[in-house]
Structures are given as structure tokens and as C-alpha cells.
Amino acid sequence: MKKIMAINAGSSSLKFQLFEMPEEKVLTKGLVERIGLPNSIFTISVNGEKITQTLDIKNHEQAVDMMLDEMKKHGIIQDINDLDGTGHRVVQGGDIFETSALVTDEVEKQIEELCELAPLHNPANLMGIRAFRKMLPNIPHVAIFDTSFHTTMPEEAFLYSLPYKYYQDYGIRKYGAHGTSHKFVAERAAELLDRPIEQLRIITCHIGNGASIAAVEGGKSVDTSMGFTPLAGVTMGTRSGNLDPAIIPFLMEKTGKTAQEVINVLNKESGLLGISGISSDLRDIEQKAEEGDERAILALDVFASRIHKYIGSYATRMKGLDAIVFTAGVGENSDIVRARVLEGLEFMGVYWDPKLNAGLRGKEAFINYPHSPVKVMVIPTDEEVMIARDTMTFGNLK
């Protein structure tokens, strides 16, 4: 029995989950928010009950220290030596990390070098890794990369039609994201279908505030919608998804904004929020659409239409399709979005049952008619359990 921590460190937050492995039993989970700001919030789950404290937590090291103290205080662990390993989500692994990796000084340095490809995420992920390595120097720490699952994409899928030297010199290519989630639900889909994953062609739809679609053929990612950064692909909560790059200099000229300011608009003020003018939260938009708000209806139409395009494209890419999987906050909980995405796909052999779809929230289920050649599933994602599994494997803890 091993105790493994799954960690997701943000610039001012630290999300943690403690597993007993290999049973995959969750012993506790929690969240530290507003690190480095006044009135930081520390939340931990003890016997299913949330305990929250407000205090000042200066940095990630202090957050880790407090987390360990609280786990001891509540009897979740007797001593820090009870912990056998930690696994850390890292957003960008470039084309260096095809799998998860045991963190060494060299690996840490490589993650730092990749910060320019994910300036919003990798520096924060690295802060978490450094804090845990300092506090717990005698156990293995493993980095689990969002991009690793997508390193199996062929060159024709990941390359942009730019001068080839930009790829050689600067690493400009499609990297994708949400790889841990796409991998988890694709593998789970194969289990539910009771078929070897090597025989399956699956489209996984990770739809949350950030969203990406992946083509998974024979258990490997062969294409995905996010690109060089998580700004590309389908319409998202506040992100634009794909657009004509000439719009950027055009907007700079028209608005007087710098390139970075325009990128901020594309990242934070666009997507569902930009089109609807209401919210980036799909629940708010669905409610307004039901009330007949035209912009809310339009936002939903655009959202579904972009996902449609990827499903059609990826089914063509794989020369057929066995299953479509919905996951993440919206994919698991919005029957409205699922219905809009599935509408009109009968020509591809997708026959979904509106009764099975209606009201389904956060549960694992098939939502297709029995005779449907293409199966449609809702599978709640569990990135933390994937992090714990890889920590066992790459930390040599099995």
C-alpha cells in the first residue's frame, strides 16, 4: 500500500489529492487559494467534510508545509514519512517528454526551458514541484505532462504550414492539451465497450471552460484541436479558438492595442463570453437561451458548430468511428450541449437516445440506441487518478 499525492499547482493555488494505491482510494483532497495574497484560503476534506481556514500563506512552500501539518493534525497521515511519492501536473512537455518523467535536476531544468511555450502554466507547475522536492527530498516526484499523450500525432497533423525552419528553430507546432484526460476517458471507453483499445477509433470531447477534441486511434492520439497553445481549436468559455491570424494586426490597427493586449482579448474576453455578452459559464448561457435571448442562442450554435467540424474531420482522419466520448464539466453535465453536438450525426452512424441523454449529469453512461453503430458515452474524467497511476509507474513504486 502506497500513499501518493496528486498535485496541480497554479500561480496562486495548489490543488491536492491523496490516494492509497494501487486501490486508488481517495484519503483526502483539498485546495489552497490566493497563495501570496492577503486572506489565503485553505480547504481540506476530512471524512467527507470540508474544513476551511482563512490566513496568509506567503508562497507554495508554506502551502505545502500547511497541507502536511493539516494532514497530520487530522490523522490522515501519522508522519510525512508516510508519503511514498508525489505526482505533478505539468501543462507543457514540448516534444521532449513523450511520457511522464521522474523529476531530477535535469528534468526540472527542461521544464523551465519549456516555460516560454506555456508562460501561464509551466512556471506555476514548477513552483509546486520545487516546493515538494524541498519539503520531501527522500521520495520520488513525478511530472505528468498534458502534452505527452499527443506526442504520437504524425507530422502532418502537428505541423503548421509555415517555413519549416520555424518548427526546427523555435519548436512552433501543435502540442495539444488535456492529454491526461483524453487518455483516461479513451482507456475507460475501451473497458466499457469490452474491446481492445488497439482496435478502436474514438473521438474524445473534453468540454469544460477550456475545451479540446481528440482523435484516438488504437489508443494513440493522432490529432487534437488545441494547438501551439490552448488558445486554438473550438470556441471555449473565454477563448476564441481558431481564427484568421490576420485579425490580430487588423485589431491592433483599429483599437490601438498591442499584440499582447489583443491576445489577452482572445484568451479572456472572447469565446462564449464574447459572443453572448452574458457569461463564460454555460449554465448562464443555457438559461438565457431558454428565455429566448438571441445572443445566448447564437453562442450555443457557434459552440456546437465548431465541435461538429472536428468530429466530422476526425472521423474522416481515422476512416471511421467506433465511439464518441463526452467528458469534463460541460461534457459530463450539459445534456443541452451534448444534444446540440450530436444533432445531425446520424449519417455517420451516430444514433443517440434523447431520453438517455436528458438530465444525465456527472455519471458514466451510454446515451446511444442499442442499434447505433457508433456508441456515445459520458465518462467523468479523473486526471488525478492518472497522475497517481503514473507516479506509481515512473517513481518505481509498484
UniProtKB/Swiss-Prot annotation:
Annotated active site: 146
PROSITE patterns, per the entry: ACETATE_KINASE_1, ACETATE_KINASE_2
Domain of life: Bacteria
List of residues binding Mg(2+): 8, 383
Residues that bind substrate: 89
Record-listed ATP binding positions: 15, 206-210, 281-283, 329-333
Site (Transition state stabilizer) residue list: 178, 239
Sorted UniProt keywords: ATP-binding, Cytoplasm, Kinase, Magnesium, Metal-binding, Nucleotide-binding, Transferase
EC assignment: 2.7.2.1
Pathway named in the protein's UniProt entry: Metabolic intermediate biosynthesis; acetyl-CoA biosynthesis; acetyl-CoA from acetate: step 1/2
Any one Gene Ontology cellular component term annotated for this protein: cytoplasm
Cellular localization per UniProt: Cytoplasm
Reported cofactor(s): Mg(2+); Mn(2+)
Binding note for cofactor: Mg(2+). Can also accept Mn(2+).
Similarity remark: Belongs to the acetokinase family.
Functional summary from the UniProt entry: Catalyzes the formation of acetyl phosphate from acetate and ATP. Can also catalyze the reverse reaction.
Name of the featured protein: Acetate kinase
Higher taxonomy: Bacteria, Bacillati, Bacillota, Bacilli, Bacillales
